[in-house]
Amino acid sequence: MSIRRDYLLRMIEQAARMLARVRELLVAGKTAEARAELERAAREAGLDLGIVLSLTPESLLPLLTNAGETDRPKCALFAELLYLERQRAIADGDTARAQRCAERAHFLFTLAYEGTTVDEETQDKISELL
């Protein structure tokens, strides 16, 4: 296995662990900790959640491209982060933020999976955001 492939697999595993941890925190009602984890993960992936939410989709798009191509894995990661941030905002009663998260997550899921077959779990998330 190549070094690049090993690195990518480690990054995927790390992201999966982080998403699972955030879900656990949300189930436990630890929304402040979940928010901190989400914000940390977003920064480590190269963008601040606040920026992702405040920019228009058109302004955000250049930050989600690599060599002129949509960075689908990055879009998928940020869609998942915003999906979980939406759940956190709902739990905290912040309906305005939850709505912004839903709109932006839907946009990012669309960018990430446009023209591809989407697994059932992801399709359920996308449908929930509409």
List the model feature ranges, each with a label:
Residues 34, 41, 79, 86-89, ...:
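Small-side-chain structural scaffolding
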Residues 27-31, 89-95, 118:
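Short, solvent-exposed secondary-structure capping/transition elements
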Residues 1-75, 103, 107-111, 128-130:
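N-terminal alpha-helical interaction modules that lie
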Residues 48, 85-88, 92, 111-115:
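Glycine-centered coil turns and helix-coil junctions that link the paired helices
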Residues 15, 22, 79-87, 93, ...:
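Conserved small-residue packing positions in alpha-helical repeats and bundles
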Residues 94-130:
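Amphipathic alpha-helical binding modules
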